[in-house]
């Protein structure tokens, strides 16, 4: 058995919730997908599908031929009817069971079972990104009985009820502290393109243990109490390497770790204020003092490794004198305590703490001092992850949002911006049914109407230009998932956006004994 130290335990194993890394880290090892995305080349290959899909001319219809002989851990068969049931649920959700739809399946109309092992998907608009979406955690395939569960059934306390077709099965759950994954001895349907391993997993299983404190995860590695640990903080990377431990910084290839501004809030409605915030933050100082070379400085809202990246570096230079001039021009005058005021109101902004992101609170502390230097008060919203997630959706609670998204797909940016989807900028207000910036939403809708990936890549570049021109975001760094592991661990990899894969892991017994 391999012991894996995780900073956060899963909170939901419903695949559309797999974006949260602790959720995706479990799903990646217990559930398969139609296609497999090579984490190095990002090329798509058959997995549960026998081949890449047959598509029509405008990418609105996709036909998959399903591999025969695949079974779920509960003994049921993975066939076309089961694939249909998976995708119909993920695309549409089910309000009665509190199951939300996947944001990665926009414009999904229906699926159709052609025969026992052939399924066809229909979309109302061109969807060239759909094949890649079939390779990700949010569309992980689960058994029919599992798909009948409600939100509670996918939540902590019910993990052993989740049945996937992956190389591991959840055997035991100690709620909130431990998860035991056991290897399936009959697993024999890995992606044929995988060169590192085929057949059942090499290891017997994985003990996923909660180690919330950074020092506990590092200490467990140094003391040989764990074999692999996730979220090794930057100051600890060198320490582990000095102890002859391995460190892997896996890219997440999507929306960078960034601050983005809820621009409908009155304090951030003036573009000059947003620009002032951007130019007041010294990212080089933050990266050199809190992070390591594993965290490249952000050059756009998208990572350099992301599909569709376009360099925007010139928009984010550190220039606090420019910040002060911009605030002066916008009518914000320093008050008695140095914090700027206008019409009797203080320029006081609240940031969220992004609990899953590395060193979010420490970074805020540095940013707080930098903004104070130009006369802006910065406050940190209090509370745990649940409280933070709720506050981020309310511009009166949080005006500057700290977050990121890992996803290796050209649709990532448009999905992230979409006011009728993720609504990351809170551009759409449901109460008034209005957009603060209609042009931004128009760009999203135009994007999803485009038929070819080339057109979408060009539009992604235009959206990046627009976000920079409007000063809606400050990209901080390209966030990796950093793992530490023992020298005797071989074959440990991640999928395309950094979630752990234990399938090909081997233990060098001789080195382990030493």
Question: Where are the regions that the model predicts?
Answer:
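Alpha-helical secondary-structure segments
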Residues: 79-85, 118-122, 126-130, 166-167, ...
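Extracellular/periplasmic solute-recognition and catalytic clefts
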Residues: 92-93, 98, 111, 171-182, ...
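Gly/Pro-rich hinge or "lid" segments in bacterial periplasmic/extracellular proteins
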Residues: 38, 43, 136-205, 215, ...
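Aromatic- and charge-enriched surface segment that lines or borders ligand/interaction sites
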Residues: 51-96, 114, 120, 267-269
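Ligand-site clamp/hinge motif
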Residues: 156-159, 187-239, 377-379, 384
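Surface-exposed binding/hinge segments that line
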Residues: 65, 101-148, 167-174
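Detector for C-terminal structural segments
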Residues: 28, 174-179, 281-314, 321, ...
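N-terminal lobe/hinge region of extracytoplasmic solute-binding protein
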Residues: 3-57, 88, 163, 497
